[in-house]
Each structure stands twice: as structure tokens, then as C-alpha cells.
Amino acid sequence: MKPTEIKKPYRMEEFLRPQMFQEVAQMVHFQWRRNPVDNSMVNASMVPFCLSAFLNVLFFGCNGWDIIGHFWLGHPANQNPPVLSITIYFSIRGLMLYLKRKEIVEFVNDLDRECPRDLVSQLDMQMDETYRNFWQRYRFIRIYSHLGGPMFCVVPLALFLLTHEGKDTPVAQHEQLLGGWLPCGVRKDPNFYLLVWSFDLMCTTCGVSFFVTFDNLFNVMQGHLVMHLGHLARQFSAIDPRQSLTDEKRFFVDLRLLVQRQQLLNGLCRKYNDIFKVAFLVSNFVGAGSLCFYLFMLSETSDVLIIAQYILPTLVLVGFTFEICLRGTQLEKASEGLESSLRSQEWYLGSRRYRKFYLLWTQYCQRTQQLGAFGLIQVNMVHFTEIMQLAYRLFTFLKSH
């Protein structure tokens, strides 16, 4: 359904659609289906997770063995630090998706239950705007992944086909897609180049699919929470305290429903943060390290093809780190909007009972919902500047040594 063609109510599945490359590669880690018994959302298959686990164990097992051999036995290192760091970054997010898969399915069902089923109520909640934002972002990710991804994968292949000097010459690191180490020297053997490149392509597709799935779930969940908080804030603004003087019993019945909904949304915000907090803590700092390596690589080369290959993941790291921090700020502001709506009321015109309740309610609303990780970080724009500063410090350290 296009955002300009509002003909029927939106369904949760429309926000959770995978990208085309994920479907072609059979890397849709959450295959959302409706349970015919209770109409709940379920993940129909675990096969993509199993395939991804096999690829990750093989890739990191081989590279881990090579790293151990380098530090303990003094063997030459075969790693490509920028690529290895971003594969770790993607795989951490994939591991989080697997470990939190039950919580993710449960949370999606929580959001699905809160979404109204009729179009009029959805428009009142401004779900059309939420879907429009999702659709614009989905198209951007589709263009970027289906153009930038193939370019990143094809550049090493083109370098090998155009510049490799012969079958007796080992494959150089810049001619490999991911680099690293594989048994029996097959990674550096030109006779096995296409086989190794195909394996790297599968690992790359797996990692990008992890990243896209994580990104879409994070943003869809955040968009729905902001939508619900905004709708509740408008309901707060519509409260007329003077009605507590005419029909106090009915007034407090309606008020109780609003407070219960606020408590429900606060609980959903906490569950949302619990799902992603470990990924925030680990992957953001790994992302800073990855960004440092990419900046170092770009500053040390003058090859146009290599610059073109590595500029894309650099922009991805900066852009998506910025967006995650921006989403945290947006959620915090949406939560603060509840308190702002209350403070704009003419509460002093209400009954004595309401005035007492209003003071307690205002104190409760001051507890804004924030994204963070174990009290160590707060995911907002300040955190984005901290990550960029950390990446710059690491970059200057590498340049000085």
C-alpha cells in the first residue's frame, strides 16, 4: 500500500516487510505470519538464522584461528581490519536478534494489539504519517542496499579480473571481498578465487541482512511508540478540567483510562529499551572502532576504486549511528510531550479532587522515557557526538603510530 493510497486499514505486516535482496538470498530472519488460531504474529521459520549461524561460525572460526596464530606463533596476519570490524558490528546485531527473538515477537504482538483496526481510528492516531515515514525510509534503504551493496561486492572482483598478474601470483588483500584466512591457502589461490568470492558474498549478504533487519525493527517499533505517545498527548490536551465540576464520576472514569494507557505505553517503552540495550552498549563502540579503521583506510590510499568501495560502509556507519541517536531523542521528546500537554491545562479550574490528582499526575509524567544501556549511556544526540569523538581519537592514535 502506497502512503498516498489510503483505501484500507494498515496492517502490522506492512511495516515489517523485508527487502528484495533478503527474499532472493533466503535471508529473511523474521518471516512474519498470522497464527490462524489467535491471529497473532509469529516467526514462521528459523532456517535463515541457522544458515547465518553456520556462515558466522565458519567465518569467525577461521579468522579467530588466524588471529591466534598471529599473536602466539608470529604468523603473518591476513586480516583486513576495516572489514573485520564491520563484520563484527553486523554480527553483534544478528546475535542480538537471535537471542531476543522471542521478546521481539512478543513486542511486535503488543504493538499489533494496540493498533486500531479501522481506518478512521488509524487516521485519528496519525498512522498514515507513521506509515509515510516508514515508506520513505524503506525506499531509501532499498535503493542504497541494492545499488551500494552490489558495488561493494563487485569492486574486488573487478580488480582481480583486470589487474591480477597470473595464476602463480597469490591473490592480494585488496582483490578479496572480505579478506582473512581460510584453510589450505584457498583464499590466496587464484584457482579458487570465484569459490572464495562466493563464500564472502554469502557472508556479506548475511551481515547486511542482519543490519537491515535490526534497523527496520528498531525504527518501526520506535515509530509506533512515538505515534501512540503523540496520540495520548493530544488526548491529554483535550481534557477539560471544568467537567470534573459537573460530572466528577464520569470524568474520573475517562481519566483512569488515559492513565492506564500511559502506564501501558511506559511499560512498552521499557520493554523496547530492554530488547536493544545490549546492542546499544556493544555495537556503538564497535561501530566507533569500525569508523576509525575506515577513515584510516581512506586516508592511506589514493586508489579510486578502493576509495569508492570503502566510502559506502563509512557513510552507512555515520548515517545509521546518527539515526539511532536521533530516534532516541525523538522518543524522549514524545515522552516529554505528555508532561507539556498536562502543563498547558487550566487545571486550577477543576474540582478539588482533580487538582490533587493533577499534582501527582504531573510528577509521574516527569519520568520521561529514554533509551540507554545499564545507566552507562543514553542514546541521544549527545551520545552521537561522543561516538564521533571516540572514532576521531582512535583515528588520530592510529595516524600517530
From Swiss-Prot:
Topology in membrane: Multi-pass membrane protein
Compartment annotation: Cell membrane
Highest taxon, organism lineage: Eukaryota
UniProt note on tissues of expression: Expressed in olfactory sensory neurons in the antenna.
Claim: Transmembrane helix is one of the keywords in the record: yes
One GO CC term on file: dendrite membrane
GO molecular-function terms, A-Z: ionotropic olfactory receptor activity; odorant binding; olfactory receptor activity
Transmembrane segments: 27-47, 53-73, 143-163, 192-212, 278-298, 304-324, 371-391
Extracellular side: 48-52, 164-191, 299-303, 392-401
GO biological process, one term: detection of chemical stimulus involved in sensory perception of smell
Pfam families: 7tm_6
Keywords (A to Z) from UniProt: Cell membrane, Membrane, Olfaction, Receptor, Sensory transduction, Transducer, Transmembrane, Transmembrane helix
Main subcellular location: membrane
Membrane topology, Cytoplasmic segments: 1-26, 74-142, 213-277, 325-370
Keyword Transmembrane attached: yes
Function: Odorant receptor which mediates acceptance or avoidance behavior, depending on its substrates. The odorant receptor repertoire encodes a large collection of odor stimuli that vary widely in identity, intensity, and duration. May form a complex with Orco to form odorant-sensing units, providing sensitive and prolonged odorant signaling and calcium permeability.
UniProt miscellaneous comment: The atypical heteromeric and topological design of the odorant receptors appears to be an insect-specific solution for odor recognition, making the OR/Orco complex an attractive target for the development of highly selective insect repellents to disrupt olfactory-mediated host-seeking behaviors of insect disease vectors. Odor-evoked OR currents are independent of known G-protein-coupled second messenger pathways.
Family membership noted in the UniProt record: Belongs to the insect chemoreceptor superfamily. Heteromeric odorant receptor channel (TC 1.A.69) family. Or49a subfamily.
Oligomer status and interactors: Interacts with Orco. Complexes exist early in the endomembrane system in olfactory sensory neurons (OSNs), coupling these complexes to the conserved ciliary trafficking pathway.
Name recorded for this polypeptide: Odorant receptor 88a
Species per Swiss-Prot/TrEMBL record: Drosophila melanogaster
Gene it is expressed from: Or88a
